[in-house]
Swiss-Prot record:
The lineage of its organism: Bacteria, Bacillati, Cyanobacteriota, Cyanophyceae, Synechococcales. Keywords: ATP synthesis, CF(0), Hydrogen ion transport, Ion transport, Lipid-binding, Membrane, Thylakoid, Transmembrane, Transmembrane helix, Transport. This is ATP synthase subunit c. Belongs to the ATPase C chain family. GO terms for cellular component: plasma membrane-derived thylakoid membrane; proton-transporting ATP synthase complex; proton-transporting two-sector ATPase complex, proton-transporting domain. F(1)F(0) ATP synthase produces ATP from ADP in the presence of a proton or sodium gradient. F-type ATPases consist of two structural domains, F(1) containing the extramembraneous catalytic core and F(0) containing the membrane proton channel, linked together by a central stalk and a peripheral stalk. During catalysis, ATP synthesis in the catalytic domain of F(1) is coupled via a rotary mechanism of the central stalk subunits to proton translocation. GO terms for molecular function: lipid binding; proton-transporting ATP synthase activity, rotational mechanism. It is found in: Cellular thylakoid membrane. It is a multi-pass membrane protein. The chain crosses the membrane at residues 7-27, 57-77. PANTHER family: ATP SYNTHASE LIPID-BINDING PROTEIN, MITOCHONDRIAL, ATPASE PROTEIN 9. It comes from Synechococcus sp. (strain CC9311). Signal peptide: none annotated. The record marks E61 as: Reversibly protonated during proton transport. The keyword Ion transport applies.
Amino acid sequence: MDSITSAASVVAAGLAVGLAAIGPGIGQGSASQGAVEGIARQPEAEGKIRGTLLLSLAFMESLTIYGLVVALVLLFANPFA
């Protein structure tokens, strides 16, 4: 593998992880904000809100994990080699 392809793969891996973390990070923050506001307004619905929040946070976090998988593929199993 030539040096330009290697350097581009490393840059792309960094961008994959970085950009894959921005969207879910913002989404998790706003989802948590909504859950806290909902629990503050209706404390009796705390269990249902918390369960829904945890499930949605797991789905959002999976997007970041997909970015990490793409970065690992670019670094260790480079399809452009």
